[in-house]
């Protein structure tokens, strides 16, 4: 494939990803919600109370350090409680203050996301998901190959 065509594809996809990021930034700042807190709190909502920090890292694709520091911040602000499970696991539970924060800030943002997706016909949504999955898989494969070449 000619480099120019690839550059245009790359510029196009990176532009769209930047635009999505900008929209999220605007939405999160309108509620004064830091991105890490949004991701962790929405993960707790998805996974259910009693979930583990490890599960949040795995499903959110945030690194463990980011999840850990966000969990500590949420605990300090009394939005969550950590309860010991089988060592070394700590189960995460929302406090009343955390549930209120979730209701007032996190759920409305998720509802905005959901409404945008509801406007897409199912066939377009499936095409979007399939295309995105293919791009992610291809990208991951080439990153792995790049890393393998650079190990030598």
Language-model-detected regions and their locations in the chain:
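A cross-family signal for key residues in well-ordered alpha-helices
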Residues: 14, 42-43, 58, 103, ...
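C-terminal regulatory/oligomerization modules of transcriptional regulators
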Residues: 1-4, 123-152
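N-terminal leader segment of winged-helix/HTH proteins
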Residues: 1-31
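Charged, amphipathic alpha-helical coiled-coil/dimerization segments
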Residues: 72-130
